[in-house]
Amino acid sequence: MSRLRPPVSDADHRAGPDDAPVTLLEYGDYECPHCGRAYPIVREVQRRMGRRLRLVFRNFPLAEMHPHAEHAAEAAEAAGVQGKFWEMHDAIFEHQAALTDADLIRYARSLGLDESRVKDELATGVHAARVREDFRSGVRSGVNGTPTFFINGTRYDGSWDLGTLLEALEGAPEDAGKRGQVRNLGTVVHE
């Protein structure tokens, strides 16, 4: 089984408590139809597990197949800088068929983000390095398609239908990778 490299850190986008016993990390592509189908399942897993789950998302845009995936990831990162990563993440997946730059700017506007800042950051590629860093970490972790999930730092290769995924999460040993993790107390965690 593949291990997550690097482990979850304060640099990651996390939803749920950092001390949750289970961490589900997804390497995803905003334009991938499989990720689009996994999105509501992951949301339901979050709802059912509540504070027992920490969700982490890392970008893994498959640009050669999905021409809008990289800019969608950069838009989510731009929203993250303004404190609304998860809101943009949700908006993108909920409107997966509409991912042009104009669409992404429209989502930014609807979320109350600084629209001109997002537009400038997309045009200049300010967040491209972060997206590439996530992608490289996925390659190091053995990711070769999306979505790819890790449960408590170990690659999960089972089915990601709701029942099977919940069963795997409920049966996961506590996340040993969190012990000794350095925390940045200024980090805001979306719950």
Whereabouts are the PLM-identified features?
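Structural alpha/beta surface segment adjacent to cysteine/selenocysteine redox centers
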Residues: 25-109, 114, 179-190
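Generic structural signal for beta-strand residues in well-ordered domains
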Residues: 15-17, 25, 48, 142
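Residue-level preference for short coil/turn positions at secondary-structure junctions
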Residues: 18-20, 51, 145
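A short beta-strand-turn-helix
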Residues: 5-22
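Short clusters of hydrophobic/aromatic residues that line enzyme substrate/ligand-binding pockets
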Residues: 14-15, 99, 122, 156
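C-terminal cap of thioredoxin/glutaredoxin-like
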Residues: 3-5, 26-28, 34-44, 105-191
